């Protein structure tokens, strides 16, 4: 084999990098379609593979029957193979169409509900602030005087209109919901085309997912074992992310939506969506939504009703968080919750709504690559392993110091 010069090697790498960037630019406009179709394919592929296994078992039984009774005619065997392939195609088509229909229906219902209930909730909040004067009166003046005294006259918040700033803050986010909903309604043709692409992509992910995975492994500039490990970790992270974090958030959202409806809270869908996103917050979690809602019920409908809501909703959501989270996670998601939380925030700011999934997956892939670089080192402890106890960790450090 002819040996390449350094200039030829550099030119080859530059050409490879240029082609990689150009191909990425081709797929960027369809990132949302590719991301969510791949996520749903990863989550539902076990069910699809189980049904495909039943089809293969039935085909094997028929083929063995032909071999034993008809001396294995090649034409019949080929016909069974074609029929099996056709059944798998139909199964993938049914999966993709049903999933697309469900996702589109749920998304459209949530978008329309948020459009109406978001405005209603904002109007109710404005009326609540103006009716009860929470930020005016003797308490506000005494608090202002206390801050002025503690700061020795350097901080004066008497001119700060807290009510106006809060309403402006909520109004900004409600307006964002309106804008996105209007864009979705106005671009209904584009949304329909994206839905078609979503169903089309999902079909091929179900049908040829293993082949596409092999192509991706071969395309990565890593050893085959490392590429397979990286891809498997990505699939595992996606499953655990949705099975643990997002499923818990979904259950909490459903429970909160039911209680918002029972207690006739204005804008139950909008508040339920806020509960979904608040479930990822550390320490406070969903309490930053249902607690103010319970207090507002106490102001508007009586403190007995408000206390009952706080007890019922709070205990139900807390039970889900305390018992369901360990049951679903089962020590599978070993990344620290603080990293998951900030990766979601940073992902949303960087990639938009897709960043809620891309952020945690990128963090997990980063630590997977770090594990690959330390492969074979006996003293290295992976972040995906359970952390050792403090005494064991101290003893290991002491032994390493002696060495």
UniProtKB/Swiss-Prot annotation:
Query: Topology versus the membrane, per the UniProt entry?
Result: Multi-pass membrane protein
Which terms in the GO cellular component ontology are assigned? plasma membrane
Q: Which UniProt keywords apply?
A: Cell membrane, Membrane, Transmembrane, Transmembrane helix, Transport
Q: Which residues cross the membrane?
A: 10-30, 31-51, 92-112, 202-222, 243-263, 271-291, 293-313, 350-370
| The organism's place on the tree of life at top rank | Bacteria
InterPro entries reported in the protein's UniProt record = AI-2E-like
Which locations, inside or outside the cell, does it occupy?
Cell membrane
PANTHER family annotated for this entry?
TRANSMEMBRANE PROTEIN, TRANSMEMBRANE PROTEIN 245
Which protein family is named in the record? Belongs to the autoinducer-2 exporter (AI-2E) (TC 2.A.86) family.
**Protein's UniProt name:** Putative transport protein TP_0553
**Organism from which the protein derives:** Treponema pallidum (strain Nichols)
What is the phylogenetic placement of the source species in the record? Bacteria, Pseudomonadati, Spirochaetota, Spirochaetia, Spirochaetales
